[in-house]
Amino acid sequence: LEPQTRKLFEVCRMREIPIFTFINKMDRPGQEPLSLLDEIEAELGLLTWAVNWPIGSGEQFRGVIDRKSREVILFDRAERGRQSKERHLKLDDPELTKLVEGELLDKALEELELLEIAGSTMDLELIHSGGLTPVFFGSAMTNFGVRPFLDAFLQMAQGPVARNSNDGLIDPLLPNFSGFV
């Protein structure tokens, strides 16, 4: 984890600001997803809940499984900077076995089962208080996984709340209020 990431997480946790995590560059070699979740939990003191789960990584990255819908979003390798085309299939669609190697899909499903048994549970209150971070996997350079991240953020994030300042409580609905940074 980068030093600036650690500092940002520390400030967010101190102020009980929700943290949404996007694990990037799944289309490049890197750490195993389970060890990344362990690292976030151990080093940042945050519980994690994977919203989606990668099928493979690096050259073998094939897409993600959405845990809630049980839908597979397949990754189509695009040139750098270009948007990846996404293909959505249900987990039980027979065509999936033609598009994704069995061992990659089996490994992803085994890891998902492990998360269901031993991982954190989805808890919106804990997300809002900054104690649990929803985790998404993808490749920002090709925009793969970015849309589901943004959609889930809109569903899970709470609206603006009043904040204390040197001048007292600032209501986000005041006409002259423009933002809180």
Which positions does each model-derived feature cover?
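Structural and coupling elements of P-loop NTPases
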Residues: 1-181
